[in-house]
Design a protein with these regions (language model features):
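A domain-start/cap signature at the N-terminus of enzymes
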Residues: 20-70
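Primarily recognizes the serine-hydrolase "nucleophile elbow" in alpha/beta-hydrolase
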Residues: 126-129, 135-180
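Extended non-globular C-terminal regions
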Residues: 286-414
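Short beta-strand/loop motif that positions the catalytic acidic residue
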Residues: 183-187
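Short beta-strand element of the alpha/beta-hydrolase
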Residues: 68-78
Length: 414
């Protein structure tokens, strides 16, 4: 399973440091041992008790009380913005009754020891300080933060599930120690979308309880209406395990909502989308609601010649996109700016004037990928004091993603 974290030492370190993670028993709330914090309000910085230099943003839902136990989601942003996911999803936390914690320190580029200490400090906060249900501790992340969340879920234990947005698992030769419930979310314009599609197949083979959500969007924290699927997923998984009572009304509402979406897929003739939505519907409600009718519909789609044709087209595009990404890497410093202007203009013309929606989304992903490649290349050569290469990388960055390029220059004082 491909990723950017490759050292087995990282896995061993996390396993050792977090081997004493939260247990799997449930007890009654004890207000005497719970830190009083204002509910229904985001607290931007709460200092960890174990390491005072480490902090997190906190949100207690409006219905929070120390007399009850609440599920918690610990969020990891790639830029260390603990408050960002809390601001986006606090209404969902209120609706479903979740505590939200967002790391202020975990971010891309940290060494293994620092990341391990941060994670250890955060998880120590889930015991004793707030009224948390130890059977329902979840980790969530976006981009590099999704890889951190997955690493915790796969190797720590004590986490019921992982919500991975915009990136998949870290790469490792080590076998997973745990199989948490897992849901991935990616936009059609996300350069990591194909990675998550492939990961979904691998999780099927590995017998994970999992689901995968695709939406029309870019490489970013998902919109609230998309993220709500993840909250529903964690609720349904908890119902299956008997952690919370079965909520028939919630289940039926979800089924009806998905049936409407599937109906629209049929109207537009998008059988790949229809297939994906049927698969997810079955995964969500399996063990909670009859799935026989949905499985029959899925079989009908899979046996149709038009679906097979659309699926073959999709696989061809994925192969083409992988080759194009490699070409962008290979040509990054060897081609001049005029060549890059023509390349990027070609993507933009296909996006604005193209009639093949699959090609349009592919070009959006390639532009997004080139933006990331430019950013990473710029930082790498700048740290080596290669000013000419840095100038070249920034010029490409300014063409493909001018807004983020300006922000990067401002951050660097350039």
């Amino acid at each position: 399973m491909k990723s950017f974290l490759r050292s087995p030492l990282w896995i061993i370190m996390l396993a050792v440091m977090m081997g004493c993670g939260p247990g799997n028993t449930r007890t009654n709330g004890n207000s005497a041992s719970v830190t009083p914090v204002e509910k229904g309000k985001i607290i931007p910085k709460v200092t960890c008790r174990k390491y005072y230099t480490i902090s997190y943003a906190l949100y207690l839902p409006k219905n929070y009380t120390a007399a009850l136990k609440f599920p918690v989601i610990i969020a990891f942003d790639p830029h260390g913005s603990g408050i960002l996911p809390l601001e986006k999803y606090k209404d969902l936390a209120d609706k479903y009754g979740y505590i939200l914690m967002g790391s202020n320190d975990s971010k891309n580029g940290l060494d293994m020891n620092t990341s391990g200490v941060i994670i250890d400090a955060l998880f120590s906060e889930t015991s004793g300080r707030y009224s948390i249900d130890s059977t329902r501790i979840y980790v969530m992340g976006f981009s590099g933060g999704a890889r951190i969340a997955s690493m915790i879920g796969l190797y720590q234990g004590g986490t019921a599930g992982v919500i991975g947005c915009g990136a998949g698992f870290p790469a490792t030769n080590q076998p997973v120690r745990f199989k948490p419930d897992y849901i991935s979310i990616a936009g059609n314009a996300d350069f990591n979308m194909n990675e998550l599609i492939n990961l979904d197949k691998q999780l099927d083979e590995a017998k994970f309880t999992h689901a995968s959500i695709l939406f029309n969007g870019k490489h970013a924290w998902p919109p609230v209406e998309i993220m709500e699927n993840a909250f529903i997923w964690t609720e349904f998984c908890s119902m299956r395990k008997g952690f919370i009572p079965k909520n028939d009304s919630m289940i039926l509402n979800f089924v009806h909502m998905q049936e409407k979406i599937i109906g629209k897929d049929k109207e537009t003739g998008d059988e790949v989308a229809e297939h994906n939505h049927l698969v997810n519907l079955i995964r969500f409600v399996d063990g909670l609601n009859s799935t026989e009718d949905f499985k029959n519909k899925l079989s009908t789609v899979e046996n149709s010649s038009s679906y097979k044709k659309q699926q073959n087209r999709l696989q061809q595009l994925i192969g083409k996109e992988m080759k194009e990404q490699q070409a962008l890497n290979d040509n990054f410093f060897s081609k001049d700016i005029d060549w890059w202007k023509k390349k990027i203009t070609n993507y933009e013309l296909r996006i604005t004037k193209g009639k093949d929606s699959s090609d349009v989304w592919m070009c959006k992903r390639l532009k997004s990928y080139l933006s990331l490649l430019s950013y990473m290349s710029y930082n790498r050569v700048l740290s080596s004091n290669d000013t000419l290469a840095a100038k070249h990388a920034m010029e490409i960055y300014e063409i493909v993603d001018p807004e983020n390029a300006d922000n990067t220059k401002a951050d660097k004082g350039k």
